[in-house]
Amino acid sequence: MSVNVSVTDGGVLEIEIDRPQARNAVNGEVAEGIAAALERLDAEDELRVGILTGAGGTFCSGMDLKAFVTGERPWAGDRGFAGITQRAAEKPLIAAVEGYALAGGFEIALACDLIVAGRDARFGIPEVKRGLVAAAGGLFRLPQRIPYHLAMELALTGDPIGAERAADVGIVNRLVEPGEALAGARELAAQIVRNAPLALAASKTVVQRAREWTEAEAWDEQGRIAGGVFGSEDAQEGAKAFAEKREPRWQGR
């Protein structure tokens, strides 16, 4: 299989692109595998967080150009390129990046909610060097998240930046030593899993959609999305656990 999926005891779904001989380039099988894993993540209540990584010390080098020239298209339904860029997971998803996250590989990472990277990782959209366009989200997601001029430099030169620079400008959440990205992502996932499922879902939705709203719309939409959380059993449990100085026992309702 080109995509390996496993579940930890803590309710974390780990998705590994396993084509190290091709630097984890995305072909049709990878796209379908990631899409299926994300469907599972969202469908199973016991799964709380996802981690997406690559085998063999490389995250992903983008689209498999050899497969592309033969007519293969690495899209998966409405999820888009690699089964993720147009519709990612509803639950939190962390990219654990080692080595290269280039072209579509960078766009996959940008489709995730959080990025943990080894200090020697490299990020870039070199499509212009190949007569192509970074059309899997990179060209509009980057200027939403980093300064305009840096986004334009990455888009027009095709040159990559290192993980430390990526962290400095806000692309990477946590830097770890080379080879420790997955461990770092697991640590971050464990922090997230400790929190209430309904509150996590509402918080992610509001943060994701905030840039679409005016301030007036934001208040209304936040109230609609988050209002039910305050009357939930989990909200009551959170208050009780705090008062009783114990860990909460979330029910997701």
Regions found by a protein language model. Name each.
Residues 15, 19, 33-34, 52, ...:
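Terminal peptide-recognition signature
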Residues 154-155, 206-210, 225-230:
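Helix-loop "lid/cap" segments that line or gate small-molecule binding pockets
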Residues 87-200, 231-232, 236-240, 246, ...:
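Crotonase-fold acyl-CoA enzyme core
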Residues 22, 54-89, 131-132, 213-214, ...:
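Glycine- (often His-adjacent) and acidic-residue-rich active-site loop
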Residues 57-61, 102-103, 124, 207:
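Short, active-site-adjacent cap segments at secondary-structure transitions
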Residues 1-55, 183:
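Conserved CoA-thioester-binding segment of acyl-CoA-metabolizing enzymes
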Residues 32-35, 74-79, 208-209:
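Short gly/ser/thr-rich secondary-structure transition/capping motifs
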